[in-house]
């Protein structure tokens, strides 16, 4: 990860994350680890199993994320990366899309990839 | 910081940050350091002097932030803290408030306080 352009890495991550979310939500398990944290609309969840259980139990089946902005910054000397996303979430059968903001803290793995250490999601109500 | 409740610390930080922004913007200098990064509506800025120059040159004088949500998570073993904020920004003379999302990565100082290492700000356009 450290050898790649951070903006390119974060954009690739964001595309991978939301396309997995929209097509095969259980596949998100590969992006979290036991120490991973998710705060979803204020609810705190920890660990890959609990996080995937939460994401797969959300009260909608079909959805489509549309990304508006992606910002990234290195998070410090441990070579993590912060990714900040804004966009819209379209649920099947709903007329209006929901606006959301989400941040990820990506940490490198020994294999040269990365995983989601921190994840905070909020809907932006009008 | 490590001895305090993270939710209490993040809430206190958020109140301090936005009240300083709304009443004495140049006073935000005390919260950043040379390594600090700000991404403001996609524009990347580094260092306390450049960050404060940006914040004090925004094209409005009077403003008032209203906070809707504050979420926080520890960012890793270095005992930093991620703070994720959503809210509204009311500018003087404008009828409608602007929705925004912002994230801060707070890092501890040797004096037991903390400073803003990462700061990403986005308006959430309707």
Curated annotation (Swiss-Prot), chains A, B:
Annotated localization: Cytoplasm; Nucleus; Nucleus envelope
Q: Which Gene3D superfamilies does this UniProt record tie to the protein?
A: 3.10.450.50
Q: From its record, what is one biological process in GO terms?
A: protein import into nucleus
Presence of keyword DNA-binding: no
- For whether the record's keyword set contains Hydrolase, the answer is no
Q: Which residues carry this modification: N-acetylserine?
A: 2
**Stretches that traverse the bilayer:** none
Tell me which InterPro entries the record gives. Answer: NTF2 (IPR045875), NTF2-like_dom_sf (IPR032710), NTF2_dom (IPR002075), Nuclear_transport_factor_2_euk (IPR018222)
Domain of life per record: Eukaryota
Domain NTF2, chain residue ranges per copy: 9-123
| Tissues where this protein is expressed | Expressed in roots, stems, leaves and flowers, and, at low levels, in siliques.
One cellular component (GO) term of this entry: nuclear envelope
What keywords were assigned to this record?
Answer: Acetylation, Cytoplasm, Nucleus, Protein transport, Transport
The record describes the protein's role as: Facilitates protein transport into the nucleus. Interacts with various nucleoporins and with Ran-GDP. Could be part of a multicomponent system of cytosolic factors that assemble at the pore complex during nuclear import.
**Complex formation:** Interacts with RAN1.
The identity of this protein, by name, is Nuclear transport factor 2B
What is the organism field in this record?
Arabidopsis thaliana (Mouse-ear cress)
Q: What is the lineage of its organism?
A: Eukaryota, Viridiplantae, Streptophyta, Embryophyta, Tracheophyta
Originating gene: NTF2B
């Amino acid at each position: 990860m450290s050898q790649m352009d951070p903006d390119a890495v974060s954009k690739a991550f964001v595309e991978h994350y939301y396309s997995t979310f929209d097509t095969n939500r259980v596949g998100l398990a590969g992006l979290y680890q036991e120490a991973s944290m998710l705060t979803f609309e204020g609810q705190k969840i920890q660990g890959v199993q609990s996080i995937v259980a939460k994401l797969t139990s959300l009260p909608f089946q079909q959805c489509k994320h549309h990304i508006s902005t992606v910002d990234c910054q290195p998070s410090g000397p441990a070579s993590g990366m912060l990714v900040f996303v804004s966009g819209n979430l379209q649920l099947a059968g709903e007329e209006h899309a929901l606006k959301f903001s989400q941040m990820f803290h990506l940490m490198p793995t020994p294999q040269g990839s990365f995983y989601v250490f921190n994840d905070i999601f909020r809907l932006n109500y009008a």
